[in-house]
């Protein structure tokens, strides 16, 4: 029986409870085939079809994926426009939330029926200097969900038992799915900005899948939030999520001066989640002296440009932030479990994934799309 409340479990509304109880029924009988979306070449047709159910390796768990968030990285994996080679054929997806249905022979700490999350980092060696220092994402042998390892755009997927995220019973799996990548990523980026309560942080791309969560995490961490995006709909969402000042880049005549005026000297930190090369470089101009620019979004073949004299005289920092480790994941999920983060999601069937990619390519995504693997 699914528990609806524990000491640290987020309250589950009756409708959400009903949705979960229907989706979390017995998974004892594991089928041989399943529905999934697979492509055989970059930018090739996205096939929604029957594919084999994978068998977990000794160190892996098999997860019956109920919902999966759709991330801009999934689009890059399909396009093949990053310098990192992608596995082909490939099942994308790396924000999968579901139920553990089978354990590999060496797995400890998990049991069938547990709720689990599939992250971007599917597995790492856990023995190199990066893994030992908490930088598992930088492991040279990192295995990446939906990129080098078939991901969560299928009904059953495998994940390394050490890296898989533990999700509390009673959690709405549709809403928690985006936290597994988008939430963890922006939470870690905010930590990298090294801010204190009351500081200003600018979120570039504030109303997209990453930005909408970054606004909430920043607010929950006690920061004042300035959002940069375009359009009235996005401004309304930004304000609804707790943002304070919104800058519409299509309307402002001088973004640098407008941002610096609104924040009385510039934000102490900037989180770049947009995929605009120009926006990234501009952030080095409006950030406050001694402030930190954090790079998160990954536009293909892009460079960040910072004028050297100003960079030195203003003593600004430019840092890259790449998802998060297991501790970051636990912390990000805890914010969600305490009701401090709401995922602004739209649920569609897995079969509609090509339509979601089309919207993403056109820049028409508001919040986060989540696919239901049963449809």
From Swiss-Prot:
Any matching Pfam family: ADH_zinc_N
KW Translocase (keyword) present: no
Residues given in the record as NAD(+) binding sites: 72-73, 76, 208-210, 229, 234, 249, 296, 321, 323, 368
Domain of life per record: Eukaryota
Cofactor note: Binds 2 Zn(2+) ions per subunit.
Keywords in alphabetical order: Membrane, Metal-binding, Mitochondrion, Mitochondrion inner membrane, NAD, Oxidoreductase, Transit peptide, Zinc
GO cellular component: cytoplasm; mitochondrial inner membrane; mitochondrial matrix; mitochondrion
GO molecular function terms noted in the UniProt entry: alcohol dehydrogenase (NAD+) activity; butanol dehydrogenase (NAD+) activity; ethanol dehydrogenase (NAD+) activity; zinc ion binding
Binding-site positions, Zn(2+) 2: 125, 128, 131, 139
Miscellaneous comment as given in the Swiss-Prot or TrEMBL entry: Present with 11600 molecules/cell in log phase SD medium.
Subunit structure: Homotetramer.
Protein name: Alcohol dehydrogenase 3, mitochondrial
Species the sequence originates in: Saccharomyces cerevisiae (strain ATCC 204508 / S288c) (Baker's yeast)
Gene name per UniProt: ADH3
């Amino acid at each position: 029986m699914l528990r609806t409340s524990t000491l640290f479990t987020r309250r589950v509304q009756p409708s959400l409870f009903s949705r979960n109880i229907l989706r979390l029924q017995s998974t004892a009988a594991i089928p041989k085939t399943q529905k999934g979306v697979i492509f055989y070449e970059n930018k090739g047709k996205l096939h929604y079809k029957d594919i084999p159910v994978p068998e977990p390796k000794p160190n892996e768990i098999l997860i019956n994926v109920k919902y999966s968030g759709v991330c801009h990285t999934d689009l890059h994996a399909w396009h093949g426009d990053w310098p990192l080679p992608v596995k082909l054929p490939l099942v994308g997806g790396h924000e999968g939330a579901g139920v553990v249905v089978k354990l590999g022979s060496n797995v400890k700490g998990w049991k069938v029926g547990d709720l689990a999350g599939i992250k971007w980092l599917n597995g790492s060696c856990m023995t190199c200097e990066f893994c030992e220092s908490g930088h598992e994402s930088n492991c040279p042998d990192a295995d990446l969900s939906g990129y080098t390892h078939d991901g969560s755009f299928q009904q059953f997927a495998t994940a390394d038992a050490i890296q898989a995220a533990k999700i509390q019973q009673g959690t709405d799996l549709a809403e928690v799915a985006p936290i597994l990548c988008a939430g963890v990523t922006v939470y870690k980026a905010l930590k990298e900005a090294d801010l204190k309560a009351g500081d200003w942080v600018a979120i570039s791309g504030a109303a997209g899948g990453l930005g909408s969560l970054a606004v909430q995490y920043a607010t929950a961490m006690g920061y004042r939030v300035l959002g940069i995006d375009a359009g009235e709909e996005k401004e309304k969402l930004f304000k609804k999520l707790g943002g304070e000042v919104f800058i519409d880049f299509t309307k402002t005549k001088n973004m640098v001066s407008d941002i610096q005026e609104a924040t009385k000297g510039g934000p102490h930190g900037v989180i770049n989640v947009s995929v605009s090369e120009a926006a990234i470089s501009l952030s080095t101009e409006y950030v406050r002296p001694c402030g930190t620019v954090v790079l998160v979004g990954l536009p293909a073949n892009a460079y960040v440009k910072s004028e050297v004299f100003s960079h030195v005289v203003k003593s600004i920092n430019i840092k890259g932030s790449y998802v998060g480790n297991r501790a970051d994941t636990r912390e990000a999920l805890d914010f969600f479990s305490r009701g401090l983060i709401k995922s602004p999601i739209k649920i569609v069937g897995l079969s509609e994934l090509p339509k979601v990619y089309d919207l993403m390519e056109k820049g028409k995504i508001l919040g986060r799309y989540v696919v239901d693997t049963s449809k």
